[in-house]
């Protein structure tokens, strides 16, 4: 059976939940839809990690954030960035994991009160850990109300 074709009026009547971005975040990104998938890409040493950490802190005001730190782990550079952006202020809403097992992440996200935002740093390291396109797509489709943010180097 063919899938439904939507008229412009049908699309306009679909209820979507927007993320309540405020201030500079709203100025730059507007109010994106909950459950979107983001891809943040920039050259190495361009401030990407600092931007993502500030973004994660803002997201903690909306819901919990799980930072999948595959490239950097939890070493000195991560410790410094956490201190620089005072991530201890959002201690209860921000968690870091370093396990690249996509099935383990799926189990974690299936639990009640799991993170609303998942930041995967980086896409390349996730791919090396076995995150093939079909598995990643299935993960995103299973958790449609969660926002996935992939960080990538150009």
Label every PLM stretch briefly.
Residues 16-19, 45-46, 74-75, 128-129:
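A short linear-motif detector with a strong N-terminal bias
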Residues 2, 20-22, 76-80:
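Short amphipathic alpha-helical surface micro-motifs
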Residues 1-15:
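Charged, amphipathic alpha-helical linker segments immediately N-terminal to NTP-binding catalytic cores
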Residues 16-32:
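Pre-Walker A adenine-sensing motif
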Residues 33-42, 50-54, 99-154:
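P-loop NTPase motor core
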Residues 34-104:
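Conserved P-loop
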């Amino acid at each position: 059976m063919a899938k439904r074709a939507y008229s412009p009026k049908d699309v306009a009547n679909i209820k979507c939940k927007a993320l309540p971005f405020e201030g500079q975040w709203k100025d730059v990104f507007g109010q994106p839809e909950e459950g979107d998938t983001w891809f943040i890409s920039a050259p190495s040493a361009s401030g990407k990690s600092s931007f993502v950490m500030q973004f994660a802190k803002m997201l903690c005001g909306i819901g919990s954030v799980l930072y999948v730190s595959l490239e950097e782990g939890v070493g000195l550079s991560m410790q410094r960035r956490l201190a620089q952006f005072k991530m201890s202020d959002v201690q209860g809403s921000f968690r870091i994991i370093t396990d690249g097992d996509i099935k383990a992440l799926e189990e974690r996200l299936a639990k009640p009160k799991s993170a609303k935002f998942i930041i995967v740093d980086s896409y390349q390291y996730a791919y090396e850990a076995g995150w093939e396109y079909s598995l990643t797509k299935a993960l995103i489709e299973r958790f449609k109300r969660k926002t996935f943010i992939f960080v990538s180097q150009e």
